[in-house]
């Protein structure tokens, strides 16, 4: 099972490690990983959920795409390889297609039909507070290129917290639901803290 989302997290971890120890092996590993993500995107037309037994999934999730965008931009910040910056911009542009007018995210796109979808059967196939974390690559790219449109989009995404926030301050997993999920609540808080910073 190959899982692109965790690959994005790994690229972010490499930046953390490189900041501690300027080991050139970290850069070599990061280049191989970023090249794999670029090839995956070019082959499938998006950041797919995963590959099971050599069979790729044809669904691209906004959340996974944002984690890969963040990882690629993190790696760019240590590698200074413009190819990674260009791919990070491409992923952020792809993310913009998932954003609804109210700042919430459509959860997934079927790459076969080129249609956005949502399903009430699985928590991650619905709009949720977890998508507030998708603001992070918008803020990060803004820090790199100072494009104020990116800053505004990141803020608009974070402002969706009020759609999910309960009277006690917690965040509901989905719109107009009472279910609280610690995992997704942490994602929402992470996106808000990143935006605040």
Label for each model-derived stretch:
Residues 1-197:
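Glycan-recognition and catalytic cores of secretory/periplasmic carbohydrate-active enzymes
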């Amino acid at each position: 099972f190959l899982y692109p989302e965790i690959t994005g997290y790994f690229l972010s971890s490499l930046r953390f490690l490189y900041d501690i120890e300027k080991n050139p092996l970290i850069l070599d590993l990061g280049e191989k990983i970023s090249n794999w993500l670029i090839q995956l995107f070019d082959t499938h037309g998006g950041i797919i959920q995963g590959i099971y037994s050599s069979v790729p999934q044809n669904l691209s999730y906004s959340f996974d795409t944002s984690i890969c965008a963040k990882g690629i931009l993190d790696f760019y910040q240590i590698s200074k390889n413009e190819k990674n910056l260009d791919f990070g911009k491409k992923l952020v542009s792809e993310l913009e297609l998932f954003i609804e007018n109210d700042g919430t995210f459509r959860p997934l796109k079927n790459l076969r039909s080129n249609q956005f979808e949502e399903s009430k059967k699985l928590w991650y196939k619905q709009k949720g507070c977890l998508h507030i974390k998708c603001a992070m690559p918008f803020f990060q790219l803004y820090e790199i290129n100072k494009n104020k449109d990116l800053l505004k989009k990141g803020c608009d995404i974070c402002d969706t917290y009020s759609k999910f926030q309960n009277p006690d301050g917690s965040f509901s997993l989905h719109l107009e639901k009472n279910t609280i999920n610690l995992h997704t609540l942490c994602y929402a808080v992470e996106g808000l803290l990143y935006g605040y910073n």
